[in-house]
Amino acid sequence: MYYSELVKKACAILYDAHRDDVDKGGYPYVFHPFYLATQMEGEDAVCTALLHDVLEDHGDRYSLDALARAGFPEAVLRALRLLTHAEGVPYMDYVRALAQDPIARRVKLADLRHNTDVRRLNGARPKKYDLYLQAIRYLEEV
């Protein structure tokens, strides 16, 4: 994992946004983005992994503009924009769009693999399990 002042800033935002959130397995949600970040190379990818759900889950408190003002570079902002699944957009259209950005693609692939790991979810499959597997196959092929 890459360590820098920007990564520290991303960690602080991640923790502030998700500190009270719990994942479907009952674990603190912050474990999930930290796990994804350990699989990334380079500052931009690590920051993107750490922040990948902040806008989608806590858009009432965080925005791309606020993250830009905080000093995150365009590569991170672009990937986060693509990783934020807009309401009403079919899931595979969303996946096809984000696949064009190498950082967004790597983060989403790690995210999907972690979200389909039933060991971390107390043996339960997510509702969208089959769709997630379809997205994994697509992202592995592009």
Q: What is the role of each PLM region?
A:
Residues 1-142:
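Active-site helical microenvironments for divalent-metal-assisted chemistry
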